[in-house]
UniProtKB/Swiss-Prot annotation:
PANTHER family: GLUTAMATE DEHYDROGENASE, GLUTAMATE DEHYDROGENASE 1, MITOCHONDRIAL. Substrate binds at residues 102, 126, 394. It is found in: Mitochondrion matrix. The active site is at 138. GO terms for cellular component: extracellular matrix; mitochondrial matrix; mitochondrion; phagocytic vesicle. Subject to allosteric regulation. Activated by AMP and ADP. This is Glutamate dehydrogenase, mitochondrial. The lineage of its organism: Eukaryota, Amoebozoa, Evosea, Eumycetozoa, Dictyostelia. NAD(+) binds at residues 96-98, 131. It holds the Pfam family ELFV_dehydrog_N.
Length: 502
């Protein structure tokens, strides 16, 4: 089995993976890399750049930029050794211009207050970009979930939820969490159950959290929503003439080479949808290794291998990349960072070879790296636009919970009956009968997942078109254009509410 351990520039050139003409940034010191701003400051830098395109007063912009309120809590949990761990939890609500606030909860040892404030800020503008009527929020619990048993994770989740209830930081009309890194359907079900236990008279209590299992009031299509939104967004941008001209790519997904960093919920489903559309996913990276195959990886086989072995290393037919971050530097048509923030920075930006970068993760690029790539002519589809599929479908789930009926239940059969009558009329008119398979395809009424995916596709297309229009009108990059649109939408809410801004 080949190994590209550390993937030095020399070895990359020798293997033909990196052109020799790319400028060498090996002189960048570790101190300079470490000196890049923290996540919250990165977001504020991007915000300030977009704010410069507006004519709003500094005080108005500062109010929009700063986080409204943040909560830090601590609570004890007995571990498997009988000792007591003190667990830190956080929840930040960036903006109350619309309620409820919305944002995920992550379980990670890296969670701190500035991170959740940054993510909450990003959520406000992400919601505005895709016209989801929420303010931004984010939460986290500072643990490594792999170090705790299922029973202990349940205790931690319920204790954290109880504190959110006590502080009025959760509720269908107040603040609605969702899954994030280290959490999933099960944690959301525990949150829903805990909230309902303390709010027995709230008929809409099911809407206190999204990303739940179907049996607990979830919605079909939520699990893959972010990855599918990434697919829809990149597909849309690959139909824009100016993007094709700048990147030298051809229209559509088929035949494109793709590198994905991160193989969690977002990365896996993004990879699946691109593979189904005819793209070649040539490399996939996780924290403990990456694999590369120029002819494309089999995503289902790769996922099965990872579940069995806990790593991609030694996946049959692929080349190992031990230092997984180096996978970002492999030449490809499309690079999709779908892992953590600040993965593309001053230390590795010179080696990024992708023509188009789609930010499936939150904040995967620092401002300096962003500007360098823009100057070099790369196309960057920003996180607040591209990974908004999750919050879009969370919005649909919230609406479902408030209406107390699944999408499609009231109209599916009526649609099928109407289509059947129309089809029979057409068949009798043209004197031709369709096959049963053709009839079933045409007559089929929309199920919940059909409605969800249709709504997500329409949302992503509209948001991409709005971003493109502003970028062309303002002669700016897509991140600044998306943020500009969000800022102006939030300003309109404040003005129509009779706020002092007006």
């Amino acid at each position: 089995m080949q190994s590209l351990a550390r993937l030095s520039r020399t070895s990359l050139v020798q293997k033909g993976l990196v052109p020799q003409t790319i400028k060498n940034y090996s002189s960048v010191s570790q101190a300079e890399i470490d000196n890049e701003p923290r996540f919250l400051e990165c977001f504020k830098t991007f915000f300030d750049k977009a704010a410069g395109l507006t004519n709003l007063k500094p005080g108005v912009l500062n109010n929009m930029k700063e986080c409204n309120v943040a909560l830090r809590v601590e609570f004890p949990i007995k571990n498997e050794h009988g000792d007591v761990d003190i667990i830190a939890g956080y929840r930040a609500q960036h903006s109350h211009h619309r309620l409820p606030c919305k944002g995920g909860i992550r379980f990670s040892e890296e969670v701190d207050l500035q991170e959740v404030m940054a993510l909450a800020s990003l959520m406000t503008y992400k919601c505005a970009v895709v016209d989801v009527p929420f303010g931004g929020a984010k939460g986290g619990v500072r643990i490594d979930p792999k170090k705790y048993t299922v029973a202990q994770r349940e205790k931690i989740t319920r204790a954290y939820t109880l504190l959110l209830c006590q502080k009025n930081f959760i509720g269908p009309g107040v603040d609605v969490p969702a899954p994030d890194m280290g959490t999933g359907e099960q944690e959301m079900a525990w949150i829903r159950d805990t909230y309902q236990a303390f709010n027995t008279n709230d008929v809409d209590s099911m809407a206190c959290v999204t990303g739940k299992p179907i049996s607990s009031g979830g919605i079909r299509g939520r699990t893959e929503a972010t990855g599918l939104g990434v697919f829809y967004g990149i597909r849309e941008f690959l139909s824009y003439e100016e993007v094709l001209k700048k990147t030298g790519l051809t229209p559509g997904i088929k035949g494109k080479s793709i590198v994905i960093q991160g193989f969690g919920n977002v990365g896996y489903f993004a990879a699946k949808f691109f593979e189904q559309a005819g793209a070649k996913v040539i490399a996939v990276a996780e924290h403990n290794g990456a694999v590369y195959n120029a002819d494309g990886l089999n995503i289902d086989a790769l996922n099965k291998y990872k579940l069995q072995h806990g790593t991609f290393i030694d996946f049959p037919g692929a080349t190992n990349i031990v230092d997984s971050v180096k996978a970002l530097e492999i030449p490809c048509d499309i690079l999709i960072p779908a892992a953590l923030e600040k993965q593309i920075h001053i230390g590795n930006v010179a080696d990024i070879q992708a023509k188009l970068i789609g930010e499936a993760a939150n904040g995967p690029m620092t401002p300096r790296a962003d500007q360098i790539l823009l100057n070099r002519g790369h196309v960057i589809i920003p996180d607040l636009l591209l990974n908004a599929g999750g919050v879009t479908v969370s919005y649909f789930e919230w609406l479902k919970n408030l209406s107390h009926v699944r999408f499609g239940r009231l109209n599916k059969k009526w649609e099928e009956s109407s289509k059947k009558l129309l089809l029979e009329f057409v068949e009798s008119t043209v004197n031709k009968k369709l096959s049963e398979a053709e009839r079933s395809l045409i007559i089929h009424g929309a199920d919940e997942i059909d409605i969800v995916r249709s709504g997500l596709e329409d949302t992503m297309q509209n948001a991409c078109a709005e971003t493109r229009k502003t970028a062309n009108e303002k002669n700016t990059d897509y991140r600044s254009a998306a943020l500009y649109n969000a800022i102006m939408k939030i300003k309109a809410v404040y003005e129509s509410s009779g706020n002092v801004f007006s």
